[in-house]
Amino acid sequence: MGIAKDILHIFEPNPLACGQAVLAMLTGNDVQKVIEEVGTERETTLLQMRNFLESKGISMGKCRKPVSDKNELPQFAVLSLETPKCWHWSLYADGRFYDPEYGVLEDFPPSARRYYWEVKSI
């Protein structure tokens, strides 16, 4: 399957489902289907994110990397961001940020600390 050919933005269906929305955008799946497959509509762990992506033919880098500028990011990346409210999953794809809470952005959503894992189709 691999990474979706066209990334379409999806808002998180509830304030705790940012990870599921990122997985849905990255794979082109329906977010409710992702929730069922991941097994929770609440916060997702790194392991849940990685396992879901691998089951869809997408590899996720083994190490998280700090990032401060969008020019440091690879073509596709899953982001972990420390936002004013909580830690938050987001997606970077082809020069744009697809954030489950804030929408499609040209730069990072509001965040103090930022990390990423590169993702690639296997």
What are these regions (language model features)?
Residues 97-122:
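Noncatalytic regulatory segments and standalone regulatory/sensor domains
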Residues 58, 64, 112-114:
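Short glycine-aromatic motifs
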Residues 30, 45-48, 66-69, 106-109:
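General structural signal for secondary-structure boundaries
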Residues 1-58:
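Active-site nucleophile-adjacent alpha helix/oxyanion-hole segment immediately C-terminal to the catalytic cysteine
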Residues 26-27, 68-70, 120-121:
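Extracellular and analogous surface-interaction loops
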Residues 35, 61-93, 101-102:
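Active-site-adjacent substructure of cysteine-protease-like catalytic cores
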